């Protein structure tokens, strides 16, 4: 199993609530519909609690069956079909602050 992690920050013009609503209700379904080979897609939204502040606005996680599926995603990302999703990301994510990480999962505990 291969996982992609995307650490995202919102555009400064958006409130936290606007950003999270758009990401979950608009962008999430679009990504699920357009990204080929997607096994699982999760959005991690920050917990609102007194005293908690974060330097990021969320983490996206995408699961891939194998390295070939991930490679196909990279190829797709350069295609005409991906432009709609990429343009949508630019609407609400500060792309200059996005950090991407790709990893092979090794489960240590799974209760």
What feature does the model see in each segment?
Residues 1-111:
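Macromolecular interaction modules
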């Amino acid at each position: 199993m291969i996982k992609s992690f995307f650490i995202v920050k919102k555009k400064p013009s958006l409130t936290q609530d606007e950003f999270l609503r758009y990401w979950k209700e608009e962008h999430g379904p679009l990504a699920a519909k357009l990204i080929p080979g997607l096994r699982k897609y999760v959005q991690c939204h920050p917990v609102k609690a007194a005293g908690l502040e974060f330097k990021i606005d969320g983490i996206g996680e995408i699961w891939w069956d194998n390295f070939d599926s991930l490679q196909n995603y990279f190829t797709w990302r350069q295609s005409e079909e991906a432009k709609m999703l990429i343009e949508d990301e630019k609407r609400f994510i500060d792309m200059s602050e996005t950090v991407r990480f790709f990893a092979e999962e090794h489960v240590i505990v799974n209760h």
